[in-house]
Curated annotation (Swiss-Prot):
One of its GO terms (molecular function) is oxidoreductase activity, acting on paired donors, with incorporation or reduction of molecular oxygen. It is an enzyme of class 1 (oxidoreductase). GO terms for biological process: tRNA modification. Residues 125-222 form the Rhodanese domain. Transmembrane segments: none annotated. This is tRNA uridine(34) hydroxylase. Keywords: Oxidoreductase, tRNA processing. Pfam families: Rhodanese (PF00581), UPF0176_N (PF17773). Catalyzes oxygen-dependent 5-hydroxyuridine (ho5U) modification at position 34 in tRNAs. The lineage of its organism: Bacteria, Pseudomonadati, Pseudomonadota, Alphaproteobacteria, Rickettsiales. It catalyses: uridine(34) in tRNA + AH2 + O2 = 5-hydroxyuridine(34) in tRNA + A + H2O. Disulfide bonds: none annotated.
Length: 281
């Protein structure tokens, strides 16, 4: 059976020539038969790429030849099918779009304190800690950590508005201990930096995100409930990082990532049933 290695990575660093990097990076990926998506912006690089193991190693070596990216770290998982349809390298304003102008240079922004996966469950179980899931509704409906607050955002850009309303509604103190998590860690870099920027003093983030938590702990403490949405053709994985099959609640056909992202309120519906639900609601 054919086996594919999937790597996810991000690195915040000023890439003044990021537009010039695109063609060379895309050519490298195509030459090595890789598929996935890489985002390039002035603030850094963010990507998920899959292929045969040797070619993935060559790709990572190629990326890290750039001295600005030598500190690039990545997470690996494995699958018996290619989880991407094509190879794309895109130029963006941000590698993860929070839309906060004050965070344009992440290299000089103060982010949340990293918490190792092995220490995460004990942190979020504390009564003096508020845990926030920074992902979107279509993701959180599939699974999340116990004790966590679900902002029910449709888009990551909505997160700032939710925070402002949450502070006002619950009269949240800037001394409140805040623990935050996302799928792979990159959204927490931005969201924890935002929380620090507006005045929160005790902000923590799960190092490497949910995927790293699965890799390192296998959820042995049972802090995670459900499955984890991923942005590729696996759609969702369990705590062993094995793909699961999600079926439409109405017609039982297998749903894909676009179905889930486009259905309101995070229900597991195919696009056809989702359109009918929207039309008659």
């Amino acid at each position: 059976m054919e086996k594919f290695t999937l790597v996810t990575f991000y690195h915040f660093v000023q890439l003044e020539n990021y537009e010039d990097m695109r063609d060379e990076l895309l050519s490298c990926c195509i030459e090595k038969g890789l598929k996935g998506t890489v985002l390039l912006a002035l603030e850094g690089i963010n990507g998920s790429v899959a292929g045969h193991d040797g070619e993935i190693r060559d790709f990572l070596d190629f990326v890290r030849r750039d001295e600005r990216l030598r500190g690039l770290e990545w997470k690996e998982s494995y699958t018996n099918f290619q989880p991407f349809q094509e190879m794309k390298v895109r130029l963006k304003k941000e590698i993860v779009a929070l839309g906060c102008a004050e965070l344009e240079n992440m290299e000089i922004c103060e982010t949340g304190e990293y918490v190792e996966p092995e220490d995460w469950s004990s942190l979020i179980a504390r009564e003096d800690v508020k845990t926030i899931d920074t992902r979107n509704l279509y993701e959180t409906k599939l699974g999340r950590f116990k004790y966590s607050i679900d902002p029910e955002t449709i888009n990551f850009r909505d997160f700032q508005e939710w925070v402002r309303k949450w502070i006002e509604k619950d009269n949240v103190s800037m001394e409140q201990k805040i623990a935050m998590y996302c799928t792979g860690g990159v959204r927490c870099e931005k969201s924890t930096a935002y929380m620090k920027r507006i005045g929160f003093k005790n902000v923590y983030q799960l190092k490497g995100g949910i995927i790293n938590y699965f890799l390192k702990t296998k959820n042995k403490d049972g802090a995670w409930v459900g499955d984890c949405f991923v942005f590729d053709d696996r759609v969702a994985v369990n705590v062993d990082l094995e793909p699961i099959q999600l079926k439409c609640l109405e017609c039982s056909c297998v749903v894909n990532t676009d179905d889930l992202k486009n259905i309101p309120r995070g229900r597991v519906l195919c696009s056809g049933c989702g359109q009918n639900t929207t039309r008659f609601s």
